[in-house]
Amino acid sequence: VIIPTYNEAENVKLIVARVRAAVPDADVLVADDNSPDGTGKVADELAVGDSHVHVLHRKGKEGLGAAYLAGFRWGSEHGYGVLVEMDADGSHQPEELPRLLTALKGADLALGSRWVPGGRVVNWPRHREMISRGGSLYSRMLLGLSVRDVTGGYRAFRTETLDGLGLDEVASQGYCFQVDLARRAVEAGYHVVEVPITFMEREIGDSKMSRDILVEALWRVTGWGITGRANKVLGRKAP
């Protein structure tokens, strides 16, 4: 289970404990972007007391996508067959991880979804929900995806699936990083299933959402859509 962190010292201990309780044989990788609040040190202390906890110290804040890509590489190099994305702030419920892993047995990617029947959000500001729903709808329409929650970040991948997504070409971050992986999985013909989840608004710390993340998502998704349509017209394979 890969958990990217930046200034999550107040959250990381609890989220790791919840993961370990929910799936006792799971390993956790905390990928910390040199957090000024000492998140990396807290994670190191957890790792000393639990052989299932590992820490990847990164040189600085490079974004969600870069942290996950580093985590994927680490997981692949260490021989893991399944790699999971999970937020550090408690938005993703570790107690729902067993359902994702069960769904993955019959799929290549199990995606935790807020927008399928049974999925929901709790205590999320209305404007954030509108941005997320709107972003998913815009991405789905422009990219021709059937996945309902393309911006969601609670996902379980088979490692061989990630190996087939051309991760060396991924440069996106934030919202559009998740869209990018979803579209690559669909375009590559992988079997993607959505599992209803409960998404909780964080109680401690500040959201990492920013205007720059939204702007990047808009222009990248639009670019992928235009390129994809042009490739179809010209009979070329999508990148």
Task: Annotate the PLM regions.
Residues 27, 52, 191:
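Residues at the starts of beta-strands that form the adenosine-phosphate
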Residues 32-41, 90:
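A conserved acidic beta->alpha catalytic loop
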Residues 145-146, 169-173, 182-199:
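Catalytic donor-sugar/metal-binding loop of nucleotide-sugar-dependent glycosyltransferases
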Residues 10-14, 37-46:
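Acidic helix N-cap motif at the loop->helix transition within catalytic regions
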Residues 8-22:
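Short, well-formed alpha-helical segments that are part of the catalytic scaffolds
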Residues 54-77, 82, 94-175, 202-219:
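Acceptor/aglycone-binding surface of glycosyltransferases and processive sugar-polymer synthases
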Residues 25-35, 56-57, 86:
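Short beta-strand/loop segment that forms part of the nucleotide-sugar
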